[in-house]
Amino acid sequence: KQIVSLPNIASRVVSISSADSELLITLGVSPVGVVNSRELPAEVQAKIAQYPNMNSAVSPSIERIIMSDPNLVIGIAMPFQTALRKAFNANHIPSFYHLSSNYDDIMDHIRHVGTMTGHDREAVALVQKYNDILTEIIQRHKDESAPRVLIVFGTPTSYQLASSKTYVGDIFQRLGAKNVADVYLPQDVSENALDGYIPLNLETMAVLD
């Protein structure tokens, strides 16, 4: 759990996660700094590009962020971003980091961002919209046989399998799919978002069906 101390509603927000850049704009927040990603749909990239760029999620510009005079920075709980917390603290800039391991975590994050930015109503409406969409899809396919899925997650240095203990894996599980990578999950798997990913190698693939 994190405790973020804000003197009031965060009105000058910097996002160092492209997903959060999109979220802020969707909630009606006008961020004073964002990062973009070519992995996002073109229309989303175009919206994000209208706001001041803070370089990239992997290498956010400390100088640009400080110069934007934010009263909140939102990022992801990965070392390349949480390492910036010390610099933010030294400049009296509150920062909040998240990493979601399932669908409910994402919905909670949307509500938290809404609260911190004074957009509670918009956040609640967005969560309801996503819940309605998911429910409709589940109902539409409830009588179909459950498919067996293998979800491959790629990074610049490796490939991993996303189990049902990840956000995308949780979505497939809610839709009724069987994740074949779950055979590699330990009995006492933690709620850490990264523990749901399994290294992909030839040995792993050999026993999966």
Pin down the residues of each PLM region:
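A short, structured surface patch at a secondary-structure boundary
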Residues: 17-68, 72-77, 180, 193-194
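Alpha-helical, coiled-coil/dimerization segments enriched in small aliphatic residues
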Residues: 39-40, 160-196
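Solvent-exposed loop/turn segments at secondary-structure junctions
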Residues: 19-22, 37-40, 72-73, 78-82, ...
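Extracytoplasmic substrate-binding proteins
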Residues: 3, 12, 82-160, 181-182, ...
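Short, well-structured alpha-helical segments in soluble
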Residues: 3-5, 59-67, 201-207
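Alpha-to-beta junction loops
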Residues: 68-73, 94, 177, 209
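Stable alpha-helical elements in mature extracytoplasmic
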Residues: 19-23, 61, 80, 84, ...
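Anion (oxyanion) recognition and catalysis
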Residues: 25, 89, 173
